[in-house]
Amino acid sequence: SAFFANQDSSTKKALDGDEDISFFGKHQAGITTPMQKACYLVVLDLHTTDKKEVIQLFKDWTDYSSKLVDGELVKKDGSNALLPPTDTGETVGLNPYRLSLTFGVSADFLKKLGLESKRPKLFRDLPPFPKEQLQDKYTGGDIVIQACADDEQVAFHAVRNLIRKGRNKITMKWSKSGFAAIGDRKETPRNLFGFKDGTANVTTEKEFDKVVWTDSKDW
């Protein structure tokens, strides 16, 4: 309710899930971060070609994200209960549960903003896979937000409030939620086919520098 959403984020928290992951660093969190239990992924269409508006949007998202990963509300509202709250309030009383927020953009995003010349050479579509049956409504898009946490509601709350902040410039194209049975994180978790999924994933900084991070001069 609006009443609970208006409560200060210092409201007594649950006893578990108090570990947080910084939003700031050399690389974005959520890429090399140890796997969390839940993920909420959303792809957005961008409806402006104004670079200044897009820059402001990402600044606003940075402000929100830095608070969300610390388990705070995106904004502390005033005492007037008749006004709708800025934060939707689903995480009042919850800890951050290792929430990580990761943002990505597509080649179409760069094209819309006239930034195609900045596109890294290796930034291209994956080749077709045998027998794939892609549906247009689940392909493409301009911006992707990945929210991962050890509590599904925390991940959902983060994405919901980020979208609300930019709703005059973006619309949701598609979204997907998922989970992983990560156990004690000492072993690769099994997927729903019963296979251990990700055993061969790279794990060291040297390997990440080789296959994940780009040092393209154009970027």
Task: Give the ranges of each region predicted by the language model.
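Long, histidine/aromatic-enriched segments associated with O2/redox biology
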Residues: 2-219
